[in-house]
Amino acid sequence: MNKNKRFAWKTQGVANKHNIISGNDWRFTVLTSRLIRMEFSNAGEFEDRATQIVFYRDFPDCTYKTQRQGTTLFIDTDHLHLSFDEAVGKESLQIHLKTLGVSWHYGQKLPPQLKGTTRTLDEADGSVKLEDGLCSRAGYTLMDDSGRLVLSEDGWFDRKKPEEDLYFFGYGHDYIACVQDFYRLTGAPSLL
């Protein structure tokens, strides 16, 4: 296939190795003290290419501590405490927000989110249903990047490796920092 020079984006999908903790079928990337990428793959294959949404995972070194007790992994940052039992799998995953004292468990329904934007106002006549946003009064949200296409080196879109790819945003009520780090991850939106 020919290289698509017209749509060759500058991306940095590969995360800083210092920020990665991994096992046979899982990988966690501590992007900031409040943003963690969580990947699960039965084949043990993980995706480092940029996706339709996530262009930049090359965040600087993040300060965190890891600890193991038997088969359970603990990751502590200034704001989050993650626990994961490798023997049980992703169903054991939970993240606790230290600042608000709330926890999220894998598979748990997310609390109501503050609304975001709509893609277009074309053909709108009156109110428009808004999509969920990144910010929540509960202090956390989850972005699922599993089904997105990846950007291949030749500038075309490609199918992603079969995996679950989640981003946990635990920013409490610091909505500005949440959106700033989202833009750091995705790139700033285009302006007209």
Regions found by a protein language model. Name each.
Residues 1, 6-9, 15-18, 53, ...:
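A short linear-motif detector with a strong N-terminal bias
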Residues 66-192:
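Catalytic and substrate-binding clefts that recognize carbohydrates or anionic sugar/phosphate headgroups
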Residues 18-19, 52, 93, 100:
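Residue-level marker of intrinsically disordered, low-complexity segments enriched
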Residues 15, 30, 40, 48-49, ...:
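Low-complexity, intrinsically disordered regions enriched in charged/polar residues
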Residues 8-37:
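N-terminal-proximal low-complexity accessory segments that begin disordered
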Residues 28, 36-40, 75-82:
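Short, well-ordered beta-strand segments enriched in hydrophobic/aromatic residues
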Residues 2, 6, 31-70:
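A low-complexity, Ser/Thr/Gly/Pro-enriched, surface-exposed linker/loop concept
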Residues 12-15, 20-22, 60, 67-69, ...:
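Residues that act as N-cap/strand-start positions at coil-to-secondary-structure junctions
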